[in-house]
Every structure is written in C-alpha cells, then in structure tokens.
Amino acid sequence: MQQRQAVVAKTAARYQRSRKKEKSMILSELVELTEYSRAYARRVLRQHGQRLKPGKQSLVVDVRLRAPRQRSAFYDEKVKAALLKIWRMMDYICGKRMQPALAEMVVVLERHNELHCDRLTKQKLLRVSAATIDRLLRTERRKYELRGKARTKPGTLLKHQIPIRTFAEWDEQQPGFGEIDLVGHEGGVAAGDYCQTLDLTDIATTWTETLAVRNKAQARVFEALQKVRKNLPFPLLGLDSDNGSEFINDELLRYCKHERISFTRSRPYRKNDSCFVEQKNYSIVRRAVGYARYDTDEQCQLLNELYSYLRLYTNFFLPTMKLKSKERVGSRVKKRYDQALTPYQRVLQSKLVSKAKKDQLRTKYATLNPAALKRKLERLQQRLAKTTSQTNWRECARMVAVTAAQRTNPF
C-alpha cells in the first residue's frame, strides 16, 4: 500500500500538468504498476494534493476516504411502523408468506379500524417486495427458536391390517386427505399423564384443526377425532397416521371402514412420511402453547379454548407455501414454492368443494377481525402460562424420582 501511495505521489504532479494524450499514457503506466482500475487511478491522480479551505482551516483531499452517498429511504418510518404492526399480527411470518397477503390484510384491518395510515404510506405498503419486508424487519426477527421431543409408543397388533400409504392410493390434490398426529405436552418429563393435542392437517389446502385431550388413551383420541372431523369445511376422505397405539387400534379401523375413510399409516421410524402434520406440530401447536407441561383439567380446557380461536386465526389469515419441485444442482438443492395463500383461499380455489360450503366460509370470513383474534390468543396464552406454577415442576421432579426408583428396584 505504501509503495502504491509513493508511486501515485510521484506520478500525480506529472499527470496534472500534462496534455490529454500524455495523461492517457501516464494513466496506463499507473494502472499497470498498481493494478488499480482505470477509473479509480484517474480520480486518484486528478485529485491528489488538492486543498480545501473551509474557514481558516486548510485540508488536503484524500480520495480514499470519500464520504458515502446519502440517499433518502423510500420506505420511511411510517411504512416500517405499519409493516411491523401487521407482521406482529400475522404471527411474525417471513416476507415470502407475508407479501402476497399484505394487500388483503390492509383492507381487512382498515375495515375493522385496526390500521390507520395515510394514502402514500398505504401505496408503499402495497408495492413492497418480500425481500424488502425481510430487510426492514431484520432487527425484529431473531426470536422464538425452540426445540421439542417426540414421544410415540408403537402399536403393533393391527399394523398388517392398515396399509402403508403410497402415492397411488391418495389424491393429495383433493381436499379431504389429511395426516393426524399427537403433540405431547409433557414439559420434558414423560412420567405420569399429561395433555395431548390432536393435530389434523389437510394436505391439499393446509387446513389444520387441533383439539386437546387429557391423555393419549384410545377412547379420548377417537372422540377428539370425531369432533375435529365436524369442523372441517369438506368431507374427510383419508387419514394417515404414525404407528402409535392411539391410532393403530380396532375401534378407529372399524370407524374408518364404516365411514368409507381411507386409513393408512406411515413407515416405522420414518418421521418424514408425515411431513405435513409434523410441520404444523411446530408452526401451529408449539408456537401457540410452547413446551411447558400441561397435565390438569383446567389446562386442557384452556388449551381447547385457545384452539377454538387459533383455528380461525391460522386457517383464515396465515398464508402457507407449498413445495412445487426440488432440483439438485451440484451439492445444493433448489426448491420452488407456489404463491403463499391462506388455507381459506385454497379451499375457495378448489373445484371439489361445494358452493354452499364456500359461501359459508365467505360469510364467516367477513365477520372475523384478525387483530382481535390475535389479542384474544395472547390473553389466553398468558392465562395458560400462569397455570404452569412451581408446584407443577415439583410434581414433575417427584414423578421422575419415583420412576427412577421403580427402575432400579423392581421389587
């Protein structure tokens, strides 16, 4: 660097007093010696040694310390504040999911007097891109990273009667074919009884229904499945579960045969066979109620009250993206997704859902306020959090000690 500066200092005076043709030759020599770009070398030679005299001071120009160009931000603080409010209301989703639904969400929030912005701010909101949304919200995004454990006890007696799901047997483009799973709320301690959430996800529309049960007894899970089925906006045509005994049982098998529901199961120890519902286990259930231990009747009732609002919030207002294709390029996998749509919009687009059912959904949608639903969910989450007291954790510790003692001393 010092050698380059010495060459520039020696060449600059000769360059500044030379004619145009001579300057071109001097410039070529400097580029060859220093490996500067021609434009940068020209500017260094032209401005080297120049002096500025602001007031009584005399400053020598150093072109290497050029001030960055100042440009006013197009998306100002008003846009960022409105975007932040909508983003929080939409449960902190990414820009690619948020941007396609932004125009509709602005209309809905204005209709319910939840969003107030001037005409220019609204125009900017409607033209913002997904990448810009992520950039503007970058400082607010790094939160809520949680991990969980799966606890499924296999059921083996009826496996040979329930076929493993294949793509030939299922029509994943038709609403009504869904995956089911249980999410355990054991709080990291699997001893004793604790609440379970039954999660049913439709593959075609991503419509998701959840219901809490007191434990994973077959009778409770079967009763919850019947209730969940009634909430679906289309007929239930197929069920796919893991190999847990709460699903692989004679009662559910006879029920599916009687109701003409295709009942299949995933391959043992292949968790990705149920990838759709496993994704919702986190994005809907875990994000809403966390990883604490819930093992009382009061907590089970609170969970179901929360889920009654959560189903409206997620199915009508939270967009989802579905994978269209995967292509391996070298060591990387390039994935392509469809446009983000809410489950409600996917149901309306389906030609296999009746017009009467679509009209019912439109009527229901017109009455819903997403901001009010979000506030209600947050209040219920706070009530649920208060029930996880220190006494609860002491009871967990006691059950762990009892279980450990039984293992070490079986008599």
What name fits each language-model region?
Residues 1-238, 243-411:
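Secondary-structure boundary/capping micro-motif
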